[in-house]
């Protein structure tokens, strides 16, 4: 997602607020952020394992700005349809983030984060990870995308990965990239 330069500057260690500043990639002390969260289980297979309080905790850990977010769990049919319609890819993917806030001066980050249960379960099994930890990782990943982070080039990917690892550590979740 493009945009959010102003918001990224708020995270920067550079006090000059230059537009080229990068977001902070370490979590030291983060102010509490306002969150309106809706969680939808169109596919309910993970609903018991992922209570809303746990989802909200992971979202808040990754949130640097006030936000209104919907997190929706879908099956592979809906996941594939959304990925095809919006990204031109004819397969289900683990997470899709639809950020609706392009204005750098927006007061609130607005986004829908779609998680495909089938893909999450397959990946967690293949990677020998807990489905809960894997899902929370991808929720954090989606929330970072909603706030303007991306992994389109190697530097941005490394920065986003480092930020994810720090956030997950604050939640007691091991580095998912090891």
How would you name each of these model-derived features?
Residues 1-135, 146-178:
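An acidic/histidine-cluster motif and surrounding catalytic segment
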């Amino acid at each position: 997602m493009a945009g959010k330069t102003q918001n990224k500057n708020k995270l920067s260690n550079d006090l000059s607020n230059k537009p080229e500043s990068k977001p902070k990639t370490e979590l030291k002390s983060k102010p509490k952020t306002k969150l309106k969260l809706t969680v939808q289980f169109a596919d309910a297979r993970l609903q018991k394992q992922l209570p809303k309080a746990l989802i909200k905790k992971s979202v808040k850990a990754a949130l640097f700005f006030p936000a209104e977010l919907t997190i929706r769990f879908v099956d592979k049919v809906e996941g594939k349809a959304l990925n095809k319609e919006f990204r031109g890819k004819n397969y289900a993917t683990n997470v899709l983030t639809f950020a609706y806030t392009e204005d750098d001066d927006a007061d609130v980050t607005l986004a829908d984060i779609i998680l495909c249960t089938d893909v999450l379960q397959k990946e967690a099994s293949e990677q020998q990870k807990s489905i809960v930890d894997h899902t929370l990782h991808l929720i954090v990943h989606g929330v970072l995308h909603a706030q303007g982070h991306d992994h389109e080039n190697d530097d941005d990917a490394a920065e986003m990965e480092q930020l994810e690892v720090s956030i997950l550590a604050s939640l007691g979740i091991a580095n998912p990239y090891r």
